[in-house]
């Protein structure tokens, strides 16, 4: 019996910081919009990058596990090189992996998060197999839990 089972998405998030990004403001009569820009067709140096697990199902599972709760997660992983990275991190974080849905094709969710010099973020997201989780994919008989958290 688990304390909590999370259901949601799984992604690998890559955070990229570059002071080369320009913030461009465009105003119209009714509003102003800010855009992050880089010189078109150029190679842009980055100042730093990191990768972290992301997605609502993973983020909440990690937080519950850090609080000491017996945790499992229902997420869908693709048939790619990202899938084992996420799987191993869940194991290391003491999160049960028996409810993970392993796709035989498709890509795991992936995001590139561009961080401006002001700290604002622009996210380029590929949902991958997260967008194809179906009720029939989930083994509800295996989900014995006090709580279920749908992210």
Residue ranges and their predicted role:
Residues 1-72:
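Glycine-rich phosphate/adenosyl-contacting loop at the front of the ribokinase-like
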Residues 76-78:
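Alpha-helical transmembrane segments within multi-pass membrane transporters and channels
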Residues 98-103, 113-151:
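Conserved phosphate-binding/catalytic loop of the ribokinase/pfkB sugar-kinase fold
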């Amino acid at each position: 019996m688990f304390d909590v089972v999370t259901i949601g998405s799984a992604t690998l998030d890559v955070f990229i910081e570059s002071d080369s990004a320009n913030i461009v403001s465009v105003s119209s009569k009714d509003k102003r919009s800010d855009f992050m820009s880089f010189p078109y067709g150029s190679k842009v140096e980055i100042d730093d990058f990191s990768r972290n697990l992301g997605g609502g199902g993973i983020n909440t599972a990690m937080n519950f596990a850090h609080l000491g709760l017996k945790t499992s997660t229902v997420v869908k992983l693709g048939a790619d090189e990202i899938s084992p990275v996420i799987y191993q991190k869940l194991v290391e974080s003491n999160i049960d992996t028996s409810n993970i849905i392993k796709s035989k094709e498709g890509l795991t969710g992936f995001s590139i998060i561009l961080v401006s010099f002001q700290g604002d973020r622009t996210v380029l997201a590929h949902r991958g197999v997260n967008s194809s989780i179906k009720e029939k994919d989930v083994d509800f008989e295996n989900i014995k839990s006090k709580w279920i958290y749908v992210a």
